[in-house]
Amino acid sequence: MSDTVPTSALRLHSFRALQPGPRLIVTGAVHGNETCGSRAIERLVGELDRGELVLARGCLTLLPITNPLAYRRGQRMGERNLNRNLYPNPLPQDYEDHIANVLCPLLAQHDVLLDLHSFHSAGEPFVMLGPKDNTDELEPFSHAAQEEALALALGPRRIVEGWLPTYAQGVKSRLARTSVADRARLLSVDPRYGVGTTEYMRSQGGYGVTLECGQHDDPQAPEVGWRAIRNTLAMLQMVDAP
């Protein structure tokens, strides 16, 4: 996508208001060929830098390019899918492990995550929502009401629920169809492999949603992402009403 994007560091934009408030992080280009989030975030950075938008409360972190290697190549992944098996790794094996070792602590420092993506096929934008409040082992959670309010505020009408339980059920089905002798050759048989940005955020006591802003090349997708960021800031009362 761009030969000028360095792959050895993450470029963050951090804004801290003098008044206390929520700690929000917005991420783009977790997958390198999904650039609408990057463009939406850069647009917002420009507005903040020019004083057209003023952060009144809280802390805002903007990460336009979360996977620089994938972004630089214009591909979904650098060496693997960053949005799977997202945990800190004391013995990093690939580029995305190194990203995770920076990204995971960064997520843990925030209360709310908005993760901007796009998709391959034609279709309308949609929001991916996490589980209901629960104390289950797979994905315990206690901020369902706040997360649903965030999802409803973003703009898109379509909301999809239950990614991690669906993934875990798929793992169970694959194992049931596979002989014991062949199971060792299966990849991704641990349900925790389905953990990405929002799942990790919930595991650290926060909450977050994934917004699929539209098809990769839809000219409206960056607008959907930008509007969602503005709506999030307003809903969290991090900016004053116009």
Model-assigned labels for residue ranges:
Residues 1-242:
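Structured catalytic-domain cores with a bias toward divalent-metal coordination
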